[in-house]
């Protein structure tokens, strides 16, 4: 009887371990299958954001649009972004290295690392990016919607809302950025 009980304990332990591994895997962001980095390159407008970062998220209700230029340099993804922060436009240039699949990248900065995952894109009109970063010892997530154009983004915004809700953000976490191109124009003209 004792060996039967041990055998049953072993089976239950492995079953629980398998269940835990399955649940942990289910929490990761979906990644675009067959991601084509060459189609992803170019200019993107940042038009919406989902964030649970408290004051950071609240500040975005009145924020101006940002932008991102994606280039390939020496086998690294070179990202030049501009965004509005505390009353002025900020320019950030970083390199991203590919991790665990073609649509997942790691960005290393002085302030820490970010994991950037392309979770949805059609390459021609929109892309949704899930960003995980370590801020003051805590893990924070944000999701951003980028568009190739400023026109006819209704469907992209609806898709973004569905994706953000599916990834654990609430409707109050989702913010459409103000149609103010101050930072975008500064990036395009090189004035930042």
Swiss-Prot record:
Modifications made to the protein after synthesis: 2 different forms with differently processed N-termini exist.
Disulfide feature: 89-183
One function term, GO molecular function aspect: small molecule binding
InterPro entries: Calycin, Lipocalin, Lipocalin_CS, Lipocln_cytosolic_FA-bd_dom
Domain of life: Eukaryota
Species this protein is from: Mus musculus
Subcellular location: Secreted
Induction: Down-regulated to 11% of control levels 5 days after castration and is not detectable by 20 days (at protein level). Levels are partially restored by subsequent testosterone treatment.
Keywords assigned by UniProt, alphabetized: Disulfide bond, Secreted, Signal, Transport
Function description: Associates with spermatozoa in the epididymal fluid but does not bind tightly to them. Binds both all-trans and 13-cis retinoic acid. May act as a retinoid carrier protein which is required for epididymal function and/or sperm maturation.
Name the UniProt record assigns to this protein: Epididymal-specific lipocalin-5
Expression across tissues: Epididymal fluid of the caudal and corpus regions (at protein level).
SUPFAM superfamilies for this protein: Lipocalins (SSF50814)
